[in-house]
Amino acid sequence: MLALVLAPSPLRAASAAPDANAAVTVTENASSFTLDNGIVKATIRKGSGSMASLVYRGVETMGGNGGYWEQTPQDAPQLTNTITIDPATNAGARAEVSIKGVTGGATMLGRGAPGGGTYCDMEIRYAIGRGDSGIYVYAIFNHPPNYRPGGVGSESRYITRLSPTFDWITVDKDRNMLEAAPTDWGTGVVVHAKEQRIMSKGVYKNSVEHKYSYSGVQYKTPAYGWSSTKDHIGIWFINPTIEYLSGGPTKLELDDHFGDNDNPEPIILDYWVGGHYDTGARVNLAAGEQWTRVVGPIFVYVNSLDHPKPATQAELSALAATAGNPIVPLSWHANANALWNDALAQAKKETAKWPYAWVKGVDYTPLDQRGTVTGRIVLNDPLAPKGTSSKFQQLTVGLTVPDSGNLPWIHNAKGYQFWADGTEDGSFSLSKVRPGNYTLRAFATGVLGDFAQADVTVEPGKTVNLGKLEWKPVRDGRQLWEIGYPDRTGDKFFKGDGANNWLWGWNLRYALLFPNDITYTIGKSDYRKDWFFEEVPHATDLSFVNPEARDPANQRFGWVKAESLEQYPQTNQTGPWAIYGKGRTTVWTVKFNLPKQEHGQAYLRVALAGVNGLRDGLGVGLNGQGIGAIGDGTDPDNARLITTNSIRYNADKGLNQQRTLKFDAALLKPGENQMTFTVPGGDLQSGVVWDYLRLELDENATPNPPPPTHKGQ
C-alpha cells in the first residue's frame, strides 16, 4: 500500500472539465434512481434511500455502503419511491427523488440503529440542480399523534463511506493531513478500544491512530471531508446552517475518520443526534404528540484541481524513508489546501442561499416566512476586578427551545436552533429564524456562565427588537485570583491548543512533561505553559515510550513503542492499555498570598471543559485540610459531575460543567496559602479537562459549615 501512496501523481486528476450547463436528468429502474447533471452522477437505492454511487469527473467517490442515514425506511410497511422534482417539467434545471416509509406506528429499525428503533415515519430525499458540483441530501422525520411514544434512537446521522482514492483528511487547519494507509491500520495493535490502534509500520509507525481525533465543533466547521493526492479531487460535507443540528454552538462531534474494522474506509459523518462528549441531544416524543423534523439539506460537495502541483521525486523518497514523523511533500499540502479553501468558499455560498427555494412539500419554512431577532446585550459585572473591559470577546448569541422539565435545551433535539456571532458592544442579529417560541441564550469568552431570556416569540416575516438586555455574570464576591479564562475549552492551557489537544496520549505524556506534578504560583506562573490542560493520574509505567523517539514528550507522531500483534489479542478489552494505562494519584498545588486574615464566605468557582470518572468529585484541600470536592453533590451549585469522555476521545472540550465549592474564609491565612486539587490514582482516562478557576471572597456572607472528610483529599 505504501508504494501506492507514494506513486508519482499522474496529474490527470479526473477527466476533462464537465459541461456546467448540461441539463439535469433522472432515470429509474426497479432498484434505483440515477440523477445526472453532467458534473456528478448519483445512483440512489430504492427502499433504503442510500447513495450507492457518486461519480465525479470519471472517478467513483463512494465505497462500501456508500452514503446512508443511520435510520432507513426500507422495512416500513408502506414504502414509496417517487420523483418529487422532475427535470422534464423545469427544462432540466433540477431533479429530486424521494424514498418514504410510513410505519403505522411500528418501530423503524434502521441500518444498525443504536438502541433499537425509531417510532416515526421517515422520508429521504436527494436533489441535484444544473451546475451543482455535488448532491443535496435531507431527511424528514414525522411522528403523528396516534403513534406510540418514543424517540429517534441515541444516534442519527448521515454517513458516506468513500473510495480508497481518498487519503488526505481535513477537519480544520490543524487536522489537515495525510492519513495512515488502510493496511497499516488493519495490522495495527488495539490499544484500549477498537478505534485506537498503534501503527507498527508505514509513515506513521510508532503512532496511535484514533478515530476520535477528528471531531470538530459543528458551528465552526462549515466544510470538512477528504481529498485525494492521486486523483486531486475532494469530497466535503457542507452544513449551510446548524439550525437542523442540536447541542448549540459548542457542540463537538465526529466529522471524519477511518472505519474501525481491519479493512477501513474513509468516512464522513454529519450528526444531528449524538452524544460522544455528552454534548448530544435526544428526541423524546410523548403519546399523542405531533412532531416533524427536517434535517438538511446537507450539501455533499465535490471538487477538483485542473492544475495540481506535482511532488518531486526527492519529496516522495523522503516520505518513503519516514517512519513515525512523515515528511509530507509541500505540494500535497498546497493541493489539499486549495481544495479545502474552495469548499469553504462554497460553504459561504450555500449559507447565503439558505433556506433553499426549491425545497417543497415538507415542513420547511421559506425565507419570506422567517423572522429576525435583534438586540444588544450589556454586561453588568460590578464585582469584576478593576480594569476589566465591558466589551465582549467572541460573543455568540442564539435561539433555542425552552428547557423542558429535566431535559435542558442542550440535550433536546426536538426543535431548531439559530446562532450568530455578536459584536464587541453586544449587538446581535439572528436572521432566517423559523416562527416559534424560543429562549435567547448567549456565551462569551471571558465571562463565566451564560445569559438566558425566555419567551422570545418570532412571527412570520417580522423583526423582533429586544432592545438592551442586561447580563449579570455569576459572581458573589471580590476576586482573589483566577487561572485561565472561561471559554468552555481547555485550549488556553499547555498542550490544549488546536495543534496539540487532538493528538492521542497526552494523558500518558503528562508524566513526561510534569514528572513532579504541578505547582502553580499566582502572580508568577503562566497558565499557558505551567498549567496542563488535563489533570489525570500520573503514569507509572513508561514502557509505552519509543526509545528511538527524539522528544517523546512533545513530538506529534512516532513517540509510542510499536507492539506485536501476537502479544496482544485484537479485542476491545485487552491490549497495551492493561499494562501502562494506569497511574498514581495526582496532586496539583496552587500557591497564593493574602495580606491579612480573611473572614466570611469563600467561593471556589471551577469550570470544567471535560470530565471522566471522578464519581466522588475532584478533591480540594486548603493548607493541609480537606475542604470538599468539586462535584461532590452536597450543594445545588456543586452538583455531581457528568462523564463526557473528553480525555478518552482526545478532546479539549465536552459538556461544560461549572461548579462552586463554598467554604469558610477563616481557613485562609495571612501570607502563603496552598490549595490542592487531587485526582485519584487509576485509569489514565479519568480526570478533568480544565477550563477556568477563580477564587472569590464575600466578607459579609455567613460561611458554610465544614464539609465531611472526602476520600479524594
Language-model features: locations:
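Structured interaction patches on ligand/partner-binding surfaces of diverse proteins
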Residues: 445-474
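Beta-strand-rich N-terminal accessory domains
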Residues: 14-68
